[in-house]
């Protein structure tokens, strides 16, 4: 079970580093709703494609709310944590604690 989860994680990171053959531009009318399967964050209306090991894949989900763990920005195709919603910033007051969404 642990090996399978590790393999899924490694494959997800590799997919994030490969060039994509599809057009996932911001102007695309094919944006997916929360809960739909995705392979790139720009496919999602929320702009967050989150890896879900329990459901064996990646799915569109909303960005992080106040107090939720976050990433400062989306760099690859898939997210382990989502960036913050508009109006919130992702930072940590303590370098030993994970980043959280907070009011600007």
Curated annotation (Swiss-Prot):
PROSITE patterns: COLIPASE_2. Gene3D superfamilies: Lipase, subunit A. Its main location: secreted. Disulfide bonds join 38-49, 44-60, 48-82, 70-90, 84-101. Residues 1-19 form the signal peptide. It is found in: Secreted. The keyword Plastid does not apply. Keywords: Disulfide bond, Secreted, Signal. GO terms for molecular function: enzyme activator activity. One of its GO terms (biological process) is lipid catabolic process. GO terms for cellular component: extracellular region. It comes from the Eukaryota. Belongs to the colipase family. This is Colipase-like protein 2. It comes from Rattus norvegicus (Rat). The lineage of its organism: Eukaryota, Metazoa, Chordata, Craniata, Vertebrata. The gene is Clpsl2.
